């Protein structure tokens, strides 16, 4: 898929050598990146916003071929959400080889799945003009990172991001999947609301570290999903403990059992604890997630147990 195909597909932004960015808005080209829209572009944007608001909430429509959707979310960045999403997808496949698993990265501004899953290149288009996911380790993957250069920033306004999310949700040929794991961006913004309102989500997994500042945002994330009627399956307490590789002494660097206390407050359960371990970081950075590269390690087994707990809380696909 060439750059012009990608720009047309997403209505996105093309960066100029001078640092500006152009974006198609209703047939006009408007300068973004800190500059004011022209009069015509601004008026077009207002009309578009009015049209969207007049429709009310979108009607949920299942993703074709996908039985169940599991979103992995966090209230803030840097808590290991993407690492959890990638290893959860691999753990679901490892626990039951008969299941077909997909992984969708909807973090438009900071996609991590291509790096963690060791995938590069652009998706091919099917005869019906749908994008085909890239495949590695038995997992079908789609990400905004496949559609832009690795070092190229995505400099888009909200409506462009929403258009991109719509394409990622509706214009991908997943085939037949038992589980689609969705790596959400951090926070409780437009993307989270758009995904929650456009597709039926089977359940949400909230990732947090034990420290208070992360738990505050995790609380907000869980409440957001409840307000949009998405079942919260439970919390994952990441970076729960650090064990010295030499003396084996354990230290709770980010605090002890903060996620369990939050889970009690919310009436939820902790799906599992993931330790702070060098192996997890190195495996992710090299594009060989620990569930795949070191399946017998204690760290991989922690993800495998979490996958079991997630499936146990999911309704039957026929329900």
From Swiss-Prot:
Keyword list, A-Z: 4Fe-4S, ATP-binding, Disease variant, Iron, Iron-sulfur, Metal-binding, Mitochondrion, Nucleotide-binding, Primary mitochondrial disease, Transit peptide
GO molecular-function terms, A-Z: 4 iron, 4 sulfur cluster binding; ATP binding; ATP-dependent FeS chaperone activity; metal ion binding
Domain of life: Eukaryota
Residues spanning the membrane: none
Cellular location(s): Mitochondrion
Task of the protein: Iron-sulfur cluster transfer protein involved in the assembly of the mitochondrial membrane respiratory chain NADH dehydrogenase (Complex I). May deliver one or more Fe-S clusters to complex I subunits.
UniProt name for this protein: Iron-sulfur cluster transfer protein NUBPL
Lineage of origin: Eukaryota, Metazoa, Chordata, Craniata, Vertebrata
């Amino acid at each position: 898929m060439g750059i012009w195909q990608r720009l047309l597909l997403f209505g996105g932004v093309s960066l100029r050598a001078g640092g500006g960015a152009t974006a198609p808005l209703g047939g006009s080209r408007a300068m973004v990146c800190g500059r004011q829209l022209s009069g015509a572009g601004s008026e077009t944007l207002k009309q578009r916003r009015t049209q969207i608001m007049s429709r009310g909430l979108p009607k949920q429509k299942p993703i074709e071929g996908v039985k169940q959707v599991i979103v992995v979310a966090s209230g803030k960045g840097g808590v290991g959400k993407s690492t959890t999403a990638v290893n959860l997808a691999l753990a679901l496949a490892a626990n039951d080889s008969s299941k077909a698993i997909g992984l969708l990265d909807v973090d438009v501004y900071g996609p991590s799945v291509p790096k963690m899953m060791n995938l590069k290149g652009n998706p091919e288009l099917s005869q019906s003009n749908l994008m085909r996911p890239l495949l590695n380790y038995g997992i079908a993957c789609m990400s905004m990172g496949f559609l832009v250069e690795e070092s190229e920033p995505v400099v888009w306004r909200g409506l462009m991001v929403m258009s991109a999310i719509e394409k990622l949700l509706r214009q991908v040929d997943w085939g037949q999947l038992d589980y689609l794991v969705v790596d959400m961006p951090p926070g409780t913004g437009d993307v989270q609301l758009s995904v929650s309102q456009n597709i039926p989500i089977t359940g949400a997994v909230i990732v947090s570290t034990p420290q208070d500042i992360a738990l505050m945002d995790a609380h907000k994330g869980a409440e957001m999903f409840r307000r949009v009627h998405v079942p919260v399956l439970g919390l994952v307490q990441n970076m729960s403990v650090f064990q010295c590789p030499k003396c084996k002494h354990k230290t709770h660097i980010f605090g002890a059992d903060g996620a369990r206390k939050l889970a009690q407050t919310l009436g939820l359960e902790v799906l599992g604890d993931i330790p702070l371990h060098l192996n997890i970081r190195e495996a992710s950075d090299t594009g060989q997630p620990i569930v795949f590269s070191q399946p017998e390690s204690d760290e991989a087994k922690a993800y495998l147990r979490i996958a079991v707990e997630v499936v146990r809380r999911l309704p039957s696909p026929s329900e």
